[in-house]
Amino acid sequence: MTTTENVSTERKANPVKSFLTGGFGGICNVLSGHPLDTIKVRLQTMPRPAPGEQPLYRGTFDCAAKTIKNEGVRGLYKGMSAPLTGVAPIFAMCFAGYALGKRLQQRGEDAKLTYPQIFVAGSFSGLFSTLIMAPGERIKVLLQTQQGQGGERKYNGMIDCAGKLYKEGGLRSVFKGSCATMLRDLPANGLYFLVYEALQDVAKSKSETGQISTASTIFAGGVAGMAYWILGMPADVLKSRLQSAPEGTYKHGIRSVFKDLIVKDGPLALYRGVTPIMLRAFPANAACFFGIELANKFFNIVAPNF
């Protein structure tokens, strides 16, 4: 099966179409990858063990086993309502931002961008998604960790969590971690789209028909997702710790988190949770681009000139 149109098309980018197809792809991403995201967050935010004590989780599979034992399989899906509710607009804004970033740099209708320009367009997309991403991530992290750390259940779902955050600290509390989210997404989004487009170019050059197969699109999306996390993981660890910490823990924001983590845990702590996120990255992002592929095919049938 071949794709008649995908994200890497050389035709003048269409932000509106990218908004719609990206939203559907984002839903596919969350549904396929949330359990491993929960494990990642719990590993990143687990309390430091006292001298002589064992850590709360010994690794990815231990975290999964304890979560299922203590909370059932549903425990792996804690906090999914926040990203699932916000993921359509988040991915929609991300892919629309990418299309707009490309469009602003394209000099002609069929002009092909250079790889540095693709990186810039991808980074530009991070500006669009952060406004929605940051509060959604803040709520998701709190819901994912409130049981994992053995404390009393403070939040009864997404709406309750958002309401309590606003009551306690206003919009500043709801948007806590926005700078850390942007620090992660601007460079990581740039690499994400750069890797995707480069792999699509390779697939197209090897295709006898000049068309790109669905399998190639899925593979490129999966690898791009892994590249995103290789670059974005350190900022994501800092973001998760900042967003899950009680108010006043880190007085200088992400700088305080970075200093505390490096001094007490060492630089390798910046990649804590890398195993579940890498296990998640390929299938989740492959599912995302497969969803985009299906959405594009739908539009090609019902609105071929869109």
Swiss-Prot record:
GO CC field: membrane; mitochondrial envelope; mitochondrial inner membrane
Solcar repeats: 13-104, 113-202, 212-298
Keywords: Developmental protein, Membrane, Mitochondrion, Mitochondrion inner membrane, Repeat, Transmembrane, Transmembrane helix, Transport
GO BP: carnitine transmembrane transport; epithelial cell morphogenesis; liquid clearance, open tracheal system; mitochondrial transport
SUPFAM superfamilies: Mitochondrial carrier
Origin superkingdom: Eukaryota
Free-text disruption phenotype from the record: Flies display defects in the unfolding and expansion of the wings resulting in a loss of venation and a marked decrease in their size. Lethality is polyphasic with flies dying during early larval development and displaying apparently collapsed tracheal trees.
Entry similarity comment: Belongs to the mitochondrial carrier (TC 2.A.29) family.
Alphabetized PANTHER family for the sequence: CONGESTED-LIKE TRACHEA PROTEIN-RELATED, MITOCHONDRIAL BASIC AMINO ACIDS TRANSPORTER-RELATED
This protein's name: Congested-like trachea protein
Species of origin: Drosophila melanogaster (Fruit fly)
